[in-house]
Design a protein with these regions (language model features):
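Vicinal oxygen chelate
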Residues: 1-9, 32-80, 86-116, 127-130
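Conserved active-site tyrosine of GNAT-family acetyltransferases
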Residues: 21, 25-26, 92, 120
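Short glycine-/small-residue motifs
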Residues: 122-125
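Residue-level marker for well-ordered alpha-helical positions
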Residues: 19-20, 86
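Polyanion-binding surface elements
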Residues: 12
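Conserved beta-strand-loop-alpha-helix junction that forms the acyl-donor binding cleft
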Residues: 15-17
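Major-groove DNA-recognition helix of helix-turn-helix-type DNA-binding domains
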Residues: 29
Length: 130
């Protein structure tokens, strides 16, 4: 099986406070929740699901690895392709979502803006420049 011909079907993010994170993804990003239980909430993002899992429940999922400590710095960034970064930023601002940076035109031909969820997961908005 060639992995390069597959798509990413799910992203699981470990969170400290599920209710706070659910609000951010539903109200801030405007995602639709498709499942919820006491330890997780799943949101649909196009063809990918974003699973928010309470960090204390993640050990079994990733053993023998361990959940990293919050507040030690970013280790990844998830990118959302959009048609118009400034317009997307304006929509997010109306929803109370603050940006880390941007919009910025990058030397590799992409306009970007970055934001962070309540648990420090970095999200980037990216638009190809003509």
């Amino acid at each position: 099986m060639e992995l390069s011909s597959r798509s990413i079907s799910a992203v699981t993010l470990f969170v400290a406070e599920l209710d706070r994170s659910k609000r951010w993804y539903a109200e801030g990003l405007g995602l639709d929740k498709v499942f919820e239980d006491e330890h997780s909430a799943v949101f649909r993002f196009a063809n990918t699901i974003v699973n928010l899992l309470v960090a204390s429940e993640a050990d079994e999922l990733i053993a023998p690895a361990a959940v990293g400590r919050a507040g030690t710095g970013a280790r990844s960034q998830l990118t959302i392709g959009v048609d118009d970064v400034p317009a997307a930023c304006a929509t997010l601002a109306q929803r109370g979502v603050a940006l880390l940076n941007g919009p910025v035109d990058r030397p590799w031909g992409v306009r970007t803006a970055a934001l962070t969820d309540p648990d420090g997961h970095i999200w980037e908005l990216a638009q190809e420049l003509p």
